[in-house]
Each structure stands twice: as C-alpha cells, then as structure tokens.
Amino acid sequence: MSIKNIIVIGGSGSIGSALSKELKKNNYEPILIARNEENLKKISNELNCKYFVGDVLKIDSIDKIIKNLGDNIHGLAYCVGSINLRPISLTKDEDYIESFKINTLGAINAIKLALPSLKKNKGSILLYSTVAVKQGFVNHTVISTAKGAVEGLTLSLAAELAPTIRVNCIAPSLTNSNMTNSIISNINLKKAIEVMHPIPKIGEGDDFSHIGAFLLSEKNKWMTGQILHIDGGRSTLRIKS
C-alpha cells in the first residue's frame, strides 16, 4: 500500500498534533510543519513521522518543504492560529495585517504550493476558523476578521476546486492550547466560559481530531464547502444560565 502524505501545518500545536495522531491511526502519514522544533521532535518521535521546521510568514521555507514531498501530497491541514483580544479602539492596522498573514494568507500560500499534487491525487484541504466568526464576541475584531476570511476562502476554494479537491473548515470554540493558556489558566474565567456552552467544558484538540481526519481522508467522498461548528453547542444553542 502506497504512503499517503497529509501535510499538517501547525503540527506541533494541540489541534495539529491531535489531528496528526488520528491520521496516523487511519494509516495516513502526517508530515508535520511548525516553528517549534522541540515540540515537533516530541510529536514526531511519538508518531514515528517526518517533521520540518517552517514558518508560514516565511513562505520560502514552506516552498522548500512542499517541493521536497513532490507529487505525493494527498491532503493539507492548516492548523495555524493566533489570538489577539482587545477593544477596537486599542487596535492598530498592524494587528489586523499580522493576523491576516498568519491565519489567511499563510493558508493561501501553502495551498497554492501544494495544489498540483493535491489535484493529481484528488486530495482534501482542511482549514480552521473560530466560533467567534458566527457568534460575535466582544474584543474579537482582530481574530474574527481574519478567520471570517478563512471561511470565505473555504467556500470559494471548494467551488473553484470541485470536483477534484474537497475543501472544508472546522470552527471550534475556545480550545485548550499553549496559545489560550493565558485565558484558561484563570480558574474563575475558565469556569465562566465553560458554562456558556450547553456542553460545559473547554474544547480539547481530540474533541474534533477524528472529524478532521475523516474530512481529509478518502472516506469523505461527498462533503465539501462546509463550515463545521464543533463548539459544545455555543454557536447555535441558548440555555438557561
């Protein structure tokens, strides 16, 4: 059986690493890309998979990695994110530009580089958004603007690349990670956020890794252009406080 590579950009984070573990269970070969080599080594050793150090803000580094993989790319997951929460009155143009570069432009550039191989293999693309795009939260203009663009990218790409390549997006609620640790390390704040969800807890990467692995796999034959809200019900349900 031939090896089927899935590029996981942001593979050292909680979402990317959980997805990579699930892909490995399903006989796909995750190729991890991230900036933090220490974390990459740890996950790579655990999964016995390849990793490359790369920065989405330095597209040449991603270009070299993808060229190295040749035409054996069957999927691409862009698990990179950022968090910048503040009132709009305290934001600068640079906040929005940086967030767009990390969350949106980085995904666009990676997809463009991998596109020939993805087309050849009839592959799949998985992007990540946030519940804040649909729900609308205070102090979230920076991240919601960038991730809103990711959702638009998902729909446009799904239409453009059909029927050869499937493109979908997962939009979780607050998820436990190094990036969100400054929020959820505050026990009182964590509890207050948890009870806003009909299923009252903070998300974990493995709460939606199996769905991500399915979307990237050949088992997903008929799902494209979808934004999946895996958020404990926060985006759609209202419960008594």
Locations of regions flagged by a protein language model:
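Substrate-binding pocket helix/loop in short-chain dehydrogenase/reductase
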Residues: 87-88, 95-100, 190-193
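Short, flexible catalytic-loop segment of classical short-chain dehydrogenase/reductase
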Residues: 171-182
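Alpha-helical segment proximal to the catalytic Tyr-Lys
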Residues: 116, 158-163, 221
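Conserved glycine-rich cofactor-binding loop
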Residues: 12-13
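Short C-terminal tail/terminal secondary-structure segment
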Residues: 135, 224-241
